[in-house]
């Protein structure tokens, strides 16, 4: 009996974002869950300075060698006068059937890698260039959500150009007394601050500007419940059961420390028991947002539910984490899809979307041409 050819997957992780180490954790978990009888996997670590390491070098890091040491040994092998040097190891990879990006934050979620895969004419897991870019920018996301009448929080955008006009008094009048400050193009709660007075606002804004030149200042929902929904699919996506995150009362929100440093005080309710109508509303809002943004493959949709039961869509993550405490895979597990089966479906969805896009003709043929 002839052995079926394995699918050759190129997995990229790391990157030059503040979520570099988070990405490495996600990649380990995905790799461990993949069926090695079905997949041949090449690993590509993107270093903190944006260089793609070879599979051999990446596996050294994957197996526990200090990343800085491996990078120091590999860099002299690259001819940095070559404009393609940062991605040289990727272009040399042979017979990759599909790319699986596990790069959180910029490069991975902002459409950059997706554009590279498109240039390479290769299938890939997840959303396309435009959908990734629009979803990564919280301002653009909220504009699209608002256009489609999907409830989200009030906000203003602060930039270096209008910073002097965006005083705390102005924001109190236009947004509210209690504020959340967020870099527009970051994830995993990087650079996010809650502000309830002018000094907290000024300090939070100064820190947020370290991570982006466009800052969202949003209204803060009083005592919200943080609820998440996982989406899976392409043109006909499906929504998972919902999960809730309960943070310690001493913390004001589910921040980077809660997520990745010390999660000991955080509890999860999976699935969460909410009124049936609220559950359906959140699931439908998640699906509506997924479609409005043109997403493909997967997304985790985060909500804040107010004390009176109103859901506000907070963020959409197009390459959600797969760490040990990440809710995207956990919600599918409680919805009946195992970790390994979930990865299988994501890879197949990548192939399906590539085929769909391949059917589009970009060459122009005149109507009267023979």
UniProtKB/Swiss-Prot annotation:
Stretches assigned to the ATP-grasp domain: 142-348
Gene it is expressed from: ddl
InterPro entries tied to this protein: ATP-grasp, ATP_grasp_subdomain_1, D-Ala_lig_Van_CS, D_ala_D_ala, Dala_Dala_lig_C, Dala_Dala_lig_N, PreATP-grasp_dom_sf
GO molecular function annotation: ATP binding; D-alanine-D-alanine ligase activity; metal ion binding
GO cellular component: cytosol
Binding site for ATP: 172-227
Similarity annotation: Belongs to the D-alanine--D-alanine ligase family.
NCBIfam families, per database record: D_ala_D_alaTIGR, PRK01966.1-4
GO biological process entries: cell wall organization; peptidoglycan biosynthetic process; regulation of cell shape
Catalysis performed (reactions): 2 D-alanine + ATP = D-alanyl-D-alanine + ADP + phosphate + H(+)
Swiss-Prot/TrEMBL cofactor(s): Mg(2+); Mn(2+)
Top-level taxonomic group: Bacteria
Binding site for Mg(2+) 1: 302, 315
Localization (cell): Cytoplasm
Entry binding sites for Mg(2+) 2: 315, 317
Disulfide bonds: none
EC number in record: 6.3.2.4
Cofactor stoichiometry and binding remark: Binds 2 magnesium or manganese ions per subunit.
This protein's pathway: Cell wall biogenesis; peptidoglycan biosynthesis
Keywords: ATP-binding, Cell shape, Cell wall biogenesis/degradation, Cytoplasm, Ligase, Magnesium, Manganese, Metal-binding, Nucleotide-binding, Peptidoglycan synthesis
Main function: Cell wall formation.
Name under which the protein is recorded: D-alanine--D-alanine ligase
